[in-house]
Amino acid sequence: CEFLNFPVVSGNVSFYNGTNNKNIFPTPVIGGVGLIQKLDKTMNHKFKKENSNLILIGKTFGHLEQSVFFHEIYSIFEGQPPEINLVNEKNNGESVLEIIKNDLADSVHDISHGGLIVALAEMSFETQFGVKINKPKKLTNIFEYLFGEDQSRYILEIDNINLEKTEKILKNNNIFYENIGTTQKDFFEISKEIKIDIKELYQINNQWYNNY
């Protein structure tokens, strides 16, 4: 809290949780307080237009232990959570705020549960815009890249007119970033591995959510 200058005002860990007559894992919950200086500087995560640049902030190491991918696909619940580098956490977050305050981003989303591909899908839901993502040349494992839950990462939608100013801020702050692709109309596309109609993706999500 002191390092991030972030006030946590409450917390709880319930060890006796039950949902639908089934036990669930212990669930830590914290409550924090933040201050938005100007409401017109708030930012949501919905894509706004096509042909925007998609900037990935933070390094991807492909951490899959304790990930949603391991839980849902392989029913693996063991392992260590991803490490958190507080310096990167603070610097990356403050750089994202600087970009937002300078009106350079059209949408922003943190990368957490589910990894990169889930964050991109959530940005596409309820819009007509999908993505066209290029795989890194040095990629060793597509699942680690798409579903890894490495911390301190963000996806920014940046218009071409604002790209140079955005990159200048990131370079001045010594932030690791990659331009991983663009937004496009109608389709959610990851290299040659995945191509799905946005409407179909939204329907699949609704079916899951309504039965959750």
Q: What spans do the regions from the language model cover?
A:
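Short glycine-/acidic-enriched loop or helix-start segments at secondary-structure transitions
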Residues: 65-66, 166
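A general structural motif
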Residues: 31-37, 83-93, 133-140
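Glycine-/charge-enriched secondary-structure boundary and capping motifs
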Residues: 4, 9-28, 78, 101-212
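Phosphate-binding glycine-rich loops and adjacent basic patches that engage nucleotide phosphates
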Residues: 54-61, 78-87, 127-129
